[in-house]
Amino acid sequence: MEMYFKRMKDEWTGLVEQADPPIRAKAAEIAVAHAHYLSIEFYRIVRIDPHAEEFLSNEQVERQLKSAMERWIINVLSAQVDDVERLIQIQHTVAEVHARIGIPVEIVEMGFRVLKKILYPVIFSSDYSAAEKLQVYHFSINSIDIAMEVMTRAFTFSDSSASKEDENYRIFSLLENAEEEKERQIASILSWEIDIIYKILLDSDLGSSLPLSQADFGLWFNHKGRHYFSGIAEVGHISRLIQDFDGIFNQTMRNTRNLNNRSLRVKFLLQIRNTVSQIITLLRELFEEVSRHEVGMDVLTKLLNRRFLPTIFKREIAHANRTGTPLSVLIIDVDKFKEINDTWGHNTGDEILRKVSQAFYDNVRSSDYVFRYGGDEFIIVLTEASENETLRTAERIRSRVEKTKLKAANGEDIALSLSIGAAMFNGHPDYERLIQIADEALYIAKRRGRNRVELWKASL
């Protein structure tokens, strides 16, 4: 890639050097005068494509993209020799964002085609001479084509790397502590089954019972299990079993009086038992040949490291957009960790990180993700958790750590606390924006005295 970018730098530099200065000046003049119009027209046309629309439907994104597009047009069409290296880096950065969000390369290519199409009448409606118009158009189109090539090549490289990480994460997830995960999920679905059966046998209210897809097991399967075992036939079988039983469950919940009829009650209980039994059999088959593998895991805390953060965020954001379900993030910092580490030593610091990590695991669901983000900072991705549920989870974790007892080597008690920033997904497709606003909330929590939870609001 380095050699390629050097070659493109030489080509772009050559294009700028060969163009007459008055022609370059006129191209820059066109860009400055018409960038706003070109940006608006560009997104108007691009949004007609339904595939592109899904990436541009967020109002905040559209507003930011329009202003970014204006700057991009001015930068590319006003390029001087000294600007070329910086412009190549800009294309690389834009490509990384596109890959991170998951914008397909064909949408990017369509965008460049649209830009060149709408630029033509703008240039040829100017009061330049016919020869000047042709030269300005030639310089502008070649500049855009070089920028497009650099961006597309960088995008393909980033997207390919992301695809490899997606597959690496799938394999890691499949292999990581598989036996324990299998037993945990079997216990989860059995607990759900027992809860419903007891309520039916004791004539208790079923109103608080959840359909299988919304129970802990169902959430784990939809957010993790499907991905772990992608492409294996048993996944489809489990999906159908969950879907079919949810239909029966919802129908029963609409008229619970039917359960007073013994034959209907027995039929419903057998449907529960058969569904759970089949799912457990299929789960055992899926996990049967899986063994432990720890690539992608933080050795000290046994949490995920940040390697798979893009893969998971991209998938969960796509799921949230597709289903309309909530998604939230907690960024967590151990208060005064450096001071504790410096005072009591690294062994004590490591023990604190292990205890804090255990508090995370004990207070999240199996469908959530916990990462060691770096040092004493952690990220938790909460799937299908409302704002209230997100804050309750954060407060539970904070309270648990505050009550954790830890003694230094000399017997002195060490006080532990966490500052937590929370943020709800608001439709912006770039996960780094979600992390950024959660980080802003974390900063507020620290500024307001630490040992507290703050939820990001636009007014913060």
UniProtKB/Swiss-Prot annotation:
Domain topic, free-text comment: Is composed of an N-terminal sensory globin-fold domain that binds heme and oxygen, and a C-terminal GGDEF diguanylate cyclase domain.
Fetch the Pfam families from UniProt.
DosC_2nd, GGDEF, Protoglobin
Q: Which residues does this entry assign to the site Important for oxygen binding and stability of the Fe(II)-O(2) complex?
A: 60
What is the protein's species of origin? Escherichia coli (strain K12)
Gene (name only): dosC
> Effect of altering residue 65 to G/T?
Enhanced autoxidation rate constant. Markedly enhanced O(2) association rate constant
Keyword Transcription in annotation:
yes
**Official protein name in the record:** Diguanylate cyclase DosC
The cofactors named for this UniProt entry are: heme; Mg(2+)
Q: Which reaction does it catalyse?
A: 2 GTP = 3',3'-c-di-GMP + 2 diphosphate
